[in-house]
């Protein structure tokens, strides 16, 4: 393998924001946040859904608050880039 071209592959903590579940895995993801976990400091990645909170794995239906995202997007960007018909 060539030297200096591969990203840093390291231990990272992923935190499920819906239930505060944390787990360590290895990743090349870059993050500015860190967390103390099991007596050591690790980079932290916050995620919305993990196997601890996803209905497929838990067997329970859970409503995730995502309402209003489309409206928020439309309010922010309006009709920028939308196709309009040209009258001939």
Curated annotation (Swiss-Prot):
One of its GO terms (biological process) is translation. Pfam families: Ribosomal_L31. One of its GO terms (cellular component) is ribosome. Keywords: Ribonucleoprotein, Ribosomal protein. PROSITE patterns: RIBOSOMAL_L31. GO terms for molecular function: structural constituent of ribosome. HAMAP family: Ribosomal_bL31_2. This is Large ribosomal subunit protein bL31B. It comes from Janthinobacterium sp. (strain Marseille).
